[in-house]
Design a protein with these regions (language model features):
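Sec-dependent signal peptide recognition
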Residues: 2-10
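A residue-level marker of the well-folded mature domains of exported/periplasmic proteins
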Residues: 3-4, 17, 21-305
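Hydrophobic alpha-helical targeting segments used for export or membrane insertion
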Residues: 9-17
Length: 305
């Protein structure tokens, strides 16, 4: 993706910083919510992590549960890597509360942890990712600027057990309400395309005058678009997604999805490995590292395809 910004140090520093600071090659675990295969967002996170591992000479272990709801699988994977002597963990927690005890165990045993994409509850752990409240507010502003005041609108929520889902729901609700729009439905579709379509179908049945839908990720947004196509309503309703995955950017360029919010998933993976490695080498890092957001419309969609 053309728009992504990589954060690289000088090559002469990387060798000593990245690999052999205490005489052995570091192993960093990247623990994501789902496999990159079939999911452009996680594929981009993995690509960033792999590039960082190659740049810094790190042994990278990428693991994820088979489904995003399979919290215990993620916990078991972390337990296994701690037992194998992993040097650091960069994790996107499936459920921050459920994974907190095993992460506390990791930290207590000397294994540093950083969060990527989704913040957690463990004290003193750095978060690397998007300010999701601000990103959702940016999506809400686009909707406010493009539909009449007082219009009916809906929000497709992600998993509300995750801070990402909570913050996108919060930012979108606040933004849409403050500009005078009428939120007729706020329903979870759990980041899933098929659920996005079925939930949108239900919303359309009860709210035929709806003018806009904010989908908390692109998968749900693409599902909403399919539901609108099936109902012959796509020309009457704007859909704004979140992630700017290549398929969503293509939809924006084609005039189907109206807009999406880009978050820099590649950098989450890259900086997750980079900063877990810094901690493993005894360095300090900031408490929060914001990877940024930008509005993607037809004017700049090609940059994300």
């Amino acid at each position: 993706m053309k728009f992504l910004i990589k954060f690289f140090a000088l090559a002469s520093i990387l060798f000593s910083f990245g690999v052999f600071a205490d005489g052995h090659q570091k192993t960093i675990m990247l623990s994501t919510k789902g496999p990159g295969a079939g999911n452009p967002f996680w594929a981009s996170v993995e690509a960033g992590a792999k590039d960082a591992a190659a740049e810094f000479g790190v042994n990278l272990v990428i693991l994820s549960p088979p489904q995003e709801s399979d919290v215990m699988a993620q916990v078991a994977q972390i337990e296994d890597q701690i037992a194998k002597g992993v040097d650091g963990i960069a994790i996107a927690p499936t459920d921050p509360n459920a994974v907190a005890p095993i992460l506390d165990d990791a930290i207590a045993s000397g294994v540093p942890v950083v969060y990527i994409d989704t913040n957690g509850i463990n004290e003193g752990v750095t978060f690397i990712g998007t300010n999701n409240i601000n990103g959702a507010a940016l999506a809400a502003k686009y909707i406010c600027d493009n539909v009449p005041a007082g219009s009916d609108v809906a929000i497709l929520q992600g998993m509300i057990t995750q801070t990402t889902g909570q913050h996108r729901a919060e930012g979108s609700n606040k933004g849409l309400t403050e500009c005078g729009l009428n939120i007729v439905a706020e329903l979870p579709a759990n980041w899933d395309t098929a659920q996005g379509m079925s939930v949108t179908e239900d919303i359309l049945t009860g709210n035929p005058n709806i003018k806009a839908i904010f989908a908390s990720n692109d998968n749900m947004g693409l599902g909403a678009i399919q539901a609108l196509k099936n109902a012959d309503m796509l020309s009457d309703v704007i859909v704004v997604g979140f992630d700017a995955n290549p398929d969503a950017a293509a939809s924006v360029a084609a005039g189907e999805m109206s807009a999406t919010i880009a978050q820099f998933s590649y950098n989450m993976g890259y900086m997750g490995v980079e900063n877990a490695l810094k901690l493993a080498n005894g360095e300090t890092i900031p408490d929060n590292i914001d990877t940024g957001t930008v509005l993607v419309t037809a004017e700049n969609a090609a940059d994300f395809m």
